[in-house]
């Protein structure tokens, strides 16, 4: 039975991943009152602080509200809060379908979402349709910022800028929709610069965050702590490289990480990941091809660990296109390094090793 206090909606709610996006209802949740019925509505006292604190922690936010979109957005603008919500879904659809739309737009799994509503029916509907979503009764807002799921271990510079980076993505995507020509021609207009660097101590918090947050473009889903990554950074038997991407609209931040174990005659890629935010930018294989080039120049064999799951098939396809083959049906893939794809012509590539 679902508790009316909604401390947890059911046993499945008790063990959730770190939240990447909080989706808010509006009426009697974000504000007191019903927009279409009341003459005036008022922001709940604690809401502004919660929204700004979540934003500073790198947690994205959106809206799923049954309302008239124009009136609701005008009210959010009046409260100076509209800029905090990405891809708001203000319509008469089910809350679960609105959450799915937001997840698709942000390219995030719904298992990293939380949903806040004052109506038990809406919480139950989302819990039934999307049991992976952490559902929170609006009556419990006072405890929200203290929840473990809302407290990332580190708050990095990339975290603080995450919403602004997504807003830049919205501008890019709108430009792409208006562009007349091929995708490659559009990408050429972005003036992208892809940089691979040896990870420095100041990169390690973001590196750990990437191992925890990145699920789709991730070869093994291994997670590494700050201390482990710091060890690899200083080890003669490992290469720990981090990638960043910039274009004419601004920085995507640190978006890629690779860990290579280096033995005398063979190297093994222990982890290769790319942020899903750059999935459509044609940069997904640059790090892999760079490691292949390094291995070839050092006259060593190159293999990679790969652990398949229901989210990372795209990485497997990237490996196959790069010439990697399974070794005796183990978790290892290996390449003969005969063919290494060049960096796309529309990307400026640089290293700081």
Locations of regions flagged by a protein language model:
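Basic, amphipathic juxtamembrane/active-site segments
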Residues: 34-53, 131-138
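Terminal substrate-recognition subdomain of acyl/acetyltransferases
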Residues: 105, 127, 133-190, 293-353
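Acyl-donor binding region in acyl/amide transferases
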Residues: 245, 254-326
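Conserved beta-hairpin
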Residues: 222, 227-264
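Short amphipathic alpha-helix that is part of the acyltransferase structural core
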Residues: 192-223
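Conserved Lys-Pro-Asp/Glu-containing loop-to-beta segment of HAD-superfamily phosphomonoesterases
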Residues: 99-120, 126
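Substrate-recognition element of Asp-dependent hydrolases with the DxDx(T/V) motif
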Residues: 47-77, 88-93, 206, 220-224, ...
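Non-catalytic pre-domain segments flanking phosphatase-related domains
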Residues: 1-26
